[in-house]
Amino acid sequence: MLTKGIESGDRIAFQLPGWCEFTVIYLACLKIGAVSVPLLPSWREAELVWVLNKCQAKMFFAPTLFKQTRPVDLILPLQNQLPQLQQIVGVDKLAPATSSLSLSQILADNTPLTTAITTHGDELAAVLFTSGTEGLPKGVMLTHNNILASERAYCARLNLTWQDVFMMPAPLGHATGFLHGVTAPFLIGARSVLLDIFTPAACLALLEQQRCTCMLGATPFVYDLLNLLEKQPADLSALRFFLCGGTTIPKKVARECQQRGIKLLSVYGSTESSPHAVVNLDDPLSRFMHTDGYAAAGVEIKVVDGARKTLPPGCEGEEASRGPNVFMGYFDEPELTAHALDEEGWYYSGDLCRMDEAGYIKITGRKKDIIVRGGENISSREVEDILLQHPKIHDACVVAMPDERLGERSCAYVVLKAPHHSLSLEDVVAFFSRKRVAKYKYPEHIVVIEKLPRTASGKIQKFLLRKDILQRLEQTCVEA
């Protein structure tokens, strides 16, 4: 990187699956003081152009081949839209780099650093992009001290040591994978087992073969494993616990884990403050089943009302956290930062919760207008903006509908421009595909209605649509 003109503080973006090359690039950034910007493998041209320009990335690493696509070839024609990007590097794990510089060539042509490059703990270490209520991805800025505080507290609470073997099925461009799958094992000298493409069979095989002691991920991962275990028993005696976050754990899943002797723990946090509430390993089962843990070491949690005044135990309000793990702000977004962070260092999550007398919290809902699909945030507004570009659609609103496996899926209510028009889910999927956005953002259910319910001031009454989709799903179950 240094030979390519990269300096301390420059942003280095890398869009890689769970490969060892991800770790190599991350460590290289740490060694020279560059800022890591890991990106989700599912992102396509639209998201990539936005994010690379937003963070002003100077170097971008992507696979030459992954899942029958050639990510490097997707970005090369878009260089004229990326004025800050100086170098595109093909990670030639599965296919040679024919149109760009290759990572293997960089490694072959260069020697290890001879002079140490030092950085301050409060300097920027990483920018993790997350979707939220504002639509386009936001860059969460984390310092070296943020990351160290987060992962040290996390490892201490769960008694993780060098003897543990982490299984990480989540994408490394997500906070879960980046922090808990890669960074935490570095800090304690543990081993990490990564998956580039998650399938229940591959994950179960690795859990058994590698004698993994802990697994981390969203509810769908454990849901799929439980389904497979019914047909294909496996020796998971080494597994100490499965840590689940990103969405509510269904009671059915928790009960099945209990019956199989798998300790299922809940963790709560966000990219901005990750993770800051975890249960204790020796807590009673009721804590695992009915709470999302209590504040990690060095972290404070409070529940506030609409005026951000602290509420007493048992009252529902917005969850807020403060501590050395809390991010320094959103990249180049001062207004969003000022709204999320106050002058005293409190981060207001937009999530609703209750806290009991012992300090344990339970997340009860969200103020934020997002859909959590298998642990991934989908901005309703972003999906709505794309729907409104469809030539047949006059008005649109996207809400979450419950899903047993993923927690939530997106449901689009649309008003057509002409009454005689028709619109199918297949039509919408084809339209989103042409827009080159990530597949997990596609609407998965379409309801065509005459008009959207609105207040007198013109705001859409989403709660009525959420109620409507629940009734429709219940009716479908009755008819089935």
Language-model segments: what does each one mean?
Residues 187, 212-217, 226-287, 300, ...:
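Gly/Ser/Thr-rich phosphate-binding loop
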Residues 90, 95, 107-129, 136, ...:
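Conserved pre-ATP/AMP-binding loop-to-beta segment of ANL
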Residues 148-165, 173-214, 224, 228:
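Conserved AMP-binding/adenylation subdomain of ANL enzymes
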